[in-house]
Amino acid sequence: MNYAEESLKKHGEWKGKLEVVSRVPVSTKDDLSLAYTPGVAEPCLEIQKDVEKSYEYTRRWNTCLVVTDGTAVLGLGDIGPEAGMPVMEGKCVLFKAFGDVDAFPLCIKSKDVDEIVNTVYLISGSCGGVNLEDIAAPRCFEIEKKLKEKCDIPIFHDDQHGTAIITLAGLINALKVVGKTKEEIKVVVNGAGAAATAITKLILSYGVKNVIMCDRTGAVYEGRKEGMNPFKEEMAKLTNLEKKSGSLADMVVGADVFIGVSAPGALTTEMVKTMNKDAIVFACANPTPEIFPDEAKAGGARIVSTGRSDFPNQINNVLAFPALFRGAFDVRAKDINEEMKIAASLALANLISDEELNEDYIIPAAFDPRVKDAVSKAVAQAARDSGVARI
């Protein structure tokens, strides 16, 4: 199938992938008086007395806003908020299909951090959570940070944390297959953008000790002058504690794990040959990975994962964000924290039994029917245990 031509045709037929459907009947005078005036005044007054009642008397409890400024849409780049709308609608469809979450797109015509933050904050009383989507770095970090400080609902940048959750799930199972522990491995993360930063932070939170981040300049380390910014400075303090300098090729020597969220062809077969025995390669650049699975295997990699559906072990965010929000909403969480993300990763990893686990099956399939319940329950429990659940 030619997906480009067929998708364009279908979008023309669909004229939007979302619609509003009433949950209540309005076929009699009594129906109208209950759903609207005069009866509707009573829940309004209850919410006025206690804003938390908005979760009980409206659909706020299950509503997520999918927010973008259109500056980093898929691999298309800065195409504008209107052009990003088909992606945001698609994201909302996935929220409903895989998490039973009611999601609505909000495409903002601004690139100003404070303007975007203020816009989302001012309407945050209408929803139970916010999914930030396709916002270019480094502004995505600033927007998420400021919204988390201002809002008392989950603020989640999927391009960062969704990718990190699936990557950690895959890493947990990959380590089981090769018989290594998180404490002993050396991990090289190639890329210093949104996804790379979140992956690095999450695997460190999980207990991985030795992580080196690389960008176009080479290894990121504390004291490096070239090509740094405040976000890389932060990562330099958390990673590469020996302050090693050099190229990506230098850093992967002796590494157990390569995680790429960078550029096509960044890793070569020759570089994989210099890695440790039973190397694990996560080549997640899309649509062309840092290295293709056959090339990585030729270099000695035992496990290879990509972001593509035509190869085994796909890093697919749809395994995370719908069920993650489902779990957060079920306990009316105020935040999505590291504990909840790690719980989601562990739940995903544990869906694959030791008997099923192998080099080509370390991550559940996108359509695995067990994902929603397993992840949402684990996330909800982690929210309770970490003190961010309201109920």
Predicted regions located by residue number:
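General beta-strand structural signal in soluble alpha/beta enzymes
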Residues: 105, 131-134, 155-158, 189, ...
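Adenosine-phosphate binding glycine-rich loop
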Residues: 158, 178-180, 283-391
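Rossmann-like adenosine-cofactor binding region
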Residues: 233-302, 308-310
